[in-house]
Amino acid sequence: ANKRPAWIMGHMVNAIYQIDEFVNLGANSIETDVSFDKDANPEYTYHGVPCDCGRSCLKWEYFSDFLKGLRKATTPGDSKYHAKLVLVVFDLKTGSLYDNQAYDAGKKLAKNLLKHYWNNGNNGGRAYIVLSIPDLNHYKLITGFKETLKSEGHPELMDKVGHDFSGNDAIGDVGNAYKKAGVTGHVWQSDGITNCLLRGLSRVKDAVKNRDSSNGFINKVYYWTVDKRATTREALDAGVDGVMTNYPDVITDVLNESAYKAKFRIATYDDNPWETFKN
């Protein structure tokens, strides 16, 4: 049977030591917060208060240091290497910036990743990267990122980069933002809310419908933050590709239940995260 590859996405992994912690609990993907200084430089991997219930909100690294740690965790042959860790979502906290700084934020983000993660294109980290932007008005971050990799001589690295708008906007509005940014693929669509609150699955179902339609723009759908078995089952039943969680072991347990084992498998490096799964 053709099983849907699933991404178990460790939520709020902002200290380097947490990479091991979350992957060892079953995550094959992590989400990391990125905060910016007033000049649109990515500064810290930091969430801050408030954050998910039951989590410390204050763990952080300098962004460049985190990237170096992440590179080690995703470079075959390194002592810290995890073959299982194949996708990283950067939750870009651009709310602190003016709309007209989005391009610069993308440019500076690209330079940081190029140097500290991709090692200037020389045997850098291998994980796929999703740039997750909270505000549709900040679509020029994508343009800045793409144009910088090109001008720095590494346009091929965009093959490893995907996109997400995380503001729970209407799906049509998200599609329009991608048109403006010139994005025609590599689209993950998030939907969700902090684990302190409940949220239904109606928009997730809209996103799945777009993904599975012949003219949709979405390749993968993920739901956050899912900490309970019942919610995990509901999300999987709705057909998501990824579940973001504070407890990767909980999601792993559910995926091991016979009903889900028949339909899903844990995604590996050979699963292209930009390809829509066809049953």
UniProtKB/Swiss-Prot annotation:
Molecular-function annotations in GO: lyase activity; metal ion binding; phosphoric diester hydrolase activity; toxin activity
Protein name, per record: Dermonecrotic toxin LrSicTox-alphaIA1i
Active-site residues per Swiss-Prot or TrEMBL entry: 11, 47 (nucleophile)
One protein family per Pfam: GDPD_2
Needed cofactors: Mg(2+)
Broad class of where this protein is predominantly found: secreted
Assigned EC number: 4.6.1.-
Entry similarity comment: Belongs to the arthropod phospholipase D family. Class II subfamily.
Textual note on the cofactor: Binds 1 Mg(2+) ion per subunit.
Spans through the membrane: none
Tissues/organs with expression: Expressed by the venom gland.
Enzymatic reactions: an N-(acyl)-sphingosylphosphocholine = an N-(acyl)-sphingosyl-1,3-cyclic phosphate + choline; an N-(acyl)-sphingosylphosphoethanolamine = an N-(acyl)-sphingosyl-1,3-cyclic phosphate + ethanolamine; a 1-acyl-sn-glycero-3-phosphocholine = a 1-acyl-sn-glycero-2,3-cyclic phosphate + choline; a 1-acyl-sn-glycero-3-phosphoethanolamine = a 1-acyl-sn-glycero-2,3-cyclic phosphate + ethanolamine
Entry function: Dermonecrotic toxins cleave the phosphodiester linkage between the phosphate and headgroup of certain phospholipids (sphingolipid and lysolipid substrates), forming an alcohol (often choline) and a cyclic phosphate. This toxin acts on sphingomyelin (SM). It also acts on a broad range of lysophospholipids, like lysophosphatidylinositol (LPI), lysophosphatidylglycerol (LPG), lysophosphatidylethanolamine (LPE), lysobisphosphatidic acid (LBPA), lysophosphatidylserine (LPS) and lysophosphatidylcholines (LPC) of varying chain lengths. The substrate preference is LPI > LPG > LPS > LPC >> LPE, LBPA.
UniProt-listed CDD domains: GDPD_like_SMaseD_PLD (cd08576)
GO cellular component, as recorded: extracellular region
Subcellular location: Secreted
Presence of keyword ATP-binding: no
GO biological process: killing of cells of another organism; lipid catabolic process
Regulation: Inhibited with low affinity by edelfosine.
Provenance organism: Loxosceles reclusa (Brown recluse spider)
Disulfide feature: 51-57, 53-196
Glycosylated position list: 256
Binding site for Mg(2+): 31, 33, 91
